[in-house]
Every structure is written in structure tokens, then in C-alpha cells.
Amino acid sequence: MALGGGTWQTQNKVLPGYYVNFSSVPRASATLSDRGYAAAPFELNWGPEEQVFPVTSGDMQKNSKTIFGYGYTDPALLPLREIFTHATTVYCYRLGKGAVKATNDLATAKYGGTRGNDITITVAANVDEDTLWDVSTLVDGAVVDTQTVAKSADLIANDWVTFKTPTLEATAGKPLEGGENVSAINGESHQAFLDKIEPYSYNVLCCPTADPTTVKLYQQFTSRLRDEVGSKFQLVAWQPTTADYEGIIGVWNKATHSSISSVPEHLLVYWVAGAEAGCAVNKSLTNFKYDGELTLDINYTQAELEAALKAGKFMFHNVNGDVRVLEDINTLLTLSDTKGEIFQSNQTIRVCDQIANDTAVLFATKYLGTVPNDASGRASLWGDITKLIQSLNDIRAVENFDPEIVTCEQGDTKKAVLCIVNGLNVVNAMAQLYMSVIIQ
């Protein structure tokens, strides 16, 4: 019989033999997470209902027709182009439910909405085999799918339609008809979106409505998730007059478009949401140039702009013909000993949210229910947290970081750990220059 062998946890083996454990030197797995994630609902006339679906900027550019029903440059996708100007991933949601699908005797549109009325089905005898049929799906007159089959039962659903099973016969083109959009988008539609988006993680939430009651709904959702659930993100909303909170950014400039009529005046919220989501943790949008497609109302005097800043308004203004962000601020107005002026800066909130979110992920994936709450376990947690903050120091999001300001101690119960970071210096971008020149 072979001698004993294998791995060991305690020195309690009976058989003589060789027992060995191999392991690596413990290394902190703490890393800074990427930004660029936004969540937003859209009024669409194509796409799935009542579900959140992530779309990357690459998907948007290459596959927008399949996902949203239109090519990238189509006027119908203006809100999506605005948010994707700087966001890398958007959790999209189609507002409303009950859109009617367009149909004919050959096929039914994959999704409800008026876009289905632009679909046509053609049937032609195959030129090589007279027992086969070429069945094509066209959108705006362009072929998007062709299948060669002997009978309609052999047709496979594509990105645009599901097929019925009539007897095939030649037809130059049968349009789908009867597609209708949702009759009304209201507060319930937005509440349904908020219910669906709650479990997701993102940097910025977009509220694309001018209705004050619905804006307040988004405000309450944001404050609840930030303060009670611990999900750290900021809300971008249109003129949130009652907001006084570092987690809410209020957009006030009205928007129009040079060639697209009936653009909602609040449409700028999409661009701001994407820009705030895509802004790096060590950067600011102060003086950032607007590079979307909208025409913004920037007819403000210096006195009006100063008053707007004091009121916590996120404003754009004219700088030598360019449209730029006046200052990257949120709606926080009421200051206190524990929440001072620095919390009015969105750059500060990005740093705070980065620490909160990354520490939460670190704890949940490495420590929760796994690492003993003893001195060694807390020392490991301390090491990971200090590594996170040191990473922020390395990219100049914070400065003069001393690991000694971080403590991890036994909490009030055996399973609790109390971590305190006392005296962290957050860096903000330069915004004002005061200069004295003395001439002799």
C-alpha cells in the first residue's frame, strides 16, 4: 500500500507520508472599476417591451438597425446618439407596453410599434429550382433577409418578423400593416422602468421627462438607493426644482435641433447623462465642450450664470463660440459640518462613489462569509482598501494619501467590521485662477 499523502489543514494525519500544500503569496485583488455605464429609458417604436437590455457603443454604431429598428444616423435615434456620445454601455429600456405588431398574411413583426409598418415581404420563384421559393424581408425597401424554401413552414424567424404558414405564391411585395405605438407614456411607464433597473449597477441614471411629478419620482428613487440600499450613482434630470442633493444633477439649458422638428426641450439630459457616466474618476466636466447634435439656449448674462451656479444648476454657456459646461456641479445647496462645499462638486462625488462601489464589490466577492473576522482577516481587508485608495492617489483623484488614516477594527458584533478613512484629500480640477502682478 502506498504511503499517506495529499494536502493538509491540521497536523493530524495517521499514516506516514508526504503531505504538502501549495499556495501563492496573498495578494490584494482590489482594483478600480471602469466608468461609462448609464441607464436610461427611451420612447421607441421598435424593440422589446418591459425589459432592460445592455447596449455598448460598438453595438450602437454597428447594429442599431437590428436593435432599435433604424440606422445609426436616423433622426429617430437622436436621444441614443446623444447619450452614446460619451457613455460606453447603456442599460436601455423601452417605455410603455402594449404596442401593436404590424402583420399581413405572410408574417408578423417581431416587435410592436409603427416601425413594423415599414416592413415588406416578397415571394419569388427561385431561378435555379422551380420547386423552391425565395422569400425576402425588406425594411424601407432594403433587403435584410432572404430564405429559399419549398414551403412556408420551412421559413425561420429573423430579426424583423416571424412567419406564418400560408401557401406560397409569387408577390412583388406585401407590406405589414397595423403597427401602433404605445398610446401614452406616463408616470406608471417610468415607474415600471425604475422597478426593472433597480438591481443593475451603473454610474448615472437618466430621467428623460419634463413632468415635475415624474422627475420627483426619479429623485426619490435615487435618494433611496443611494442612502438606504448603498447603490451609488447620480441622477441627471431636467430642472429638478426641489432637489438639494449631491446625487442629483439638474440640467436647465433648453434644446432644439436644426433639422429635426419637435425635439423636446429637455433632450439635453441624455448627453449630460452619457458625459457624466463617461467622465473618469480623476476628471471633471467643468469647461467641457458640448459635442452633440443639439442647439442649446445659452443666452445668459454673467449675472444669470452666477445666480444659476449658486442655485446648483448644471449650465452650459458660450465661450468664444463654443458651447461649454460652466461648472460640473450637482444640486446640493444645504451644507453642514459633515457635508461641506466640496460635496457640491461632481468630481468629489465620483471619487466617493468609486470608493463605495469598489469596496462593496471587493467585500462581497472576497470577504463576505469567507474570511474570518480576526486580526489577520481585518488586516487583509485593510490592505485591500488601502490599495484601492492608493490607486486613486496614483491617478491624482486623491492626494497625499497615508495608509495610516485607514483603520479596520472589530465592530459591535462578532461578524461586524468597522472601517474608517479619516482625512482623505479629494482632488478637484482647477476652476478659478487668482493672480497678482506687481509692476515695479
Regions found by a protein language model. Name each.
Residues 2-372, 376, 381, 388-396, ...:
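A glycine- and small-residue-enriched flexible loop/hinge signal that marks low-structured segments
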Residues 386-389, 423:
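Generic hydrophobic alpha-helical scaffold/packing signal
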Residues 407-440:
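C-terminal edge-of-domain segments
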